[in-house]
Amino acid sequence: MLRTSCGGMLLLVHALGLVRAQFPRACVTPEGLRSAQCCPSPSALESDPCGALAGPGRCVDVRMRAHGPQYPYEGATTRALARASSRACRCNGNFGGFDCGGCAHGFTGDACEQRVPVVRRNVMQLSADEKRFFVNALDQAKRAPHPDTVIATRRYSEILGPDNSTTQFENISIYNLFVWTHYYSVSKTFLGAGQDSFGGVDFSHEGPGFLTWHRYHLLQLERDMQVMLGDPSFALPYWDFAIGGSECDICTDELMGARSSSDSSSISSNSIFSRWRVICESVEEYDTLGTICNSSESSPIRRNPAGNTARPMVQRLPEPQDVEACLELTAFDSPPFYSTSSDSFRNSIEGYSAPQGNYDPVVRSLHNLAHLFLNGTGGQTHLSPNDPIFVLLHTFTDAVFDEWLRRHASDASIYPLENTPIGHNREFNMVPFWPPVTNAEMFVTAAENLGYSYEAEWPARPLTPTQIVTVAVVAALLLVAIIFAASTCVVHLRGNRTEGRQPLLGDQYQRYEDHNKTQSVV
């Protein structure tokens, strides 16, 4: 039976010797690291990399592309990935996973030939049992070690240990890996002791890759949880945060945790999430000492929805019409392909522009507004996935993205090919996922290409001027038809009344039976 895991091993590749990327555990042996090849065999046969003998996959060169001039430290982040591995598995057909020994999302079976419905639904519309199951599944993922993934505990120069043969890695849970991956994508580039770290890098925000990066991020968590639960149909639900008002409808003990009665910024002790602890909190230490975020947990989740009285703008959730306005924008993104872009669907759903597309440095809308509304762990970019509301918030953001792709019949050709922020170009590999996956591969409709779909209702679309004219013409024609039909009925009715005033037949008119007795009477 084929494994359904698509997990990878997170190995940091960073400046001056810090390795940062995502690799399978099988690739982080001393021999694997020295070979610079990560093509494990699903059958554990050295002669069968990526299942090439049976056909699931093949070992290919990893294509690296140079960053633009806006990034002066070429080789400091993902470019150093080539030092760790320059070859990876590329799976065929419906096969998937780091060694092509599993199935792609939405498929199962020995040959990955059976489709499995993976339907993401509104979390508020789940039954009580379904809500309980989801909450417990998240908690299980928080505690369960990832079956295929470990993280580096030393920089690249120290990764083989003092004896040059003991690799420096540790286990991490499924959910904490989800948090760690996001932290890495926004972390600064460490340039060495005594130097300020370079902060002009964000692989997952403020650029075209915002939507594609988070889409794959969610796919990895969903797939890991499917494997954990032994259920390939498990789907992450979404939180429709565009409800307006200042109430967090999912902040109940039945779902993501109510507000604590003793501390307005804490989660109720009746919620399982009050016992969760965050990782990747020591940002100053990482940036100044060059240490690595590891699996060590620290403080509890903080959350105070609508509690930021210093910023009234973030005390209310987005409105339903904000989503519809955003969906009506026709351009996916616009120069400079950054948080200052106008008339950009991506920048509007991300929340740096107004829903209608106009850029305003003061505005925070949609995705950004929902994060800031939470007013705590979920409102800090490097920490935000520690609050599990992050999952529901981003699943809805992805649902809006998928609806936009459907409405505008868009394909990857409209995704910027170049001149975007570091890591955001169309054919760039998204950092730090392994095996490598490009932004273009995620710029597709989900149901037809990625193995999952949404059960969602969207606000009615406003009519375009052409549609308004068409409706007016049709309405006028219908009105004429109704008037004509009514006039015809009146004329016909008057005719019937005239006929009703005519005299009855008298005796002067012959009757059949009287005129000819032999005639048949009907």
Swiss-Prot record:
The protein's annotated pathway: Pigment biosynthesis; melanin biosynthesis
Binding site for Zn(2+) B: 367, 371, 394
Cysteine disulfide links: 27-38, 39-59, 50-89, 91-100, 103-112, 248-251, 280-293
UniProt key word Disulfide bond: yes
One of the Pfam families matching this protein, by short name: Tyrosinase
Family under the similarity heading: Belongs to the tyrosinase family.
Protein name, as recorded: 5,6-dihydroxyindole-2-carboxylic acid oxidase
Organism the protein comes from: Carassius auratus
Encoding gene per record: tyrp1
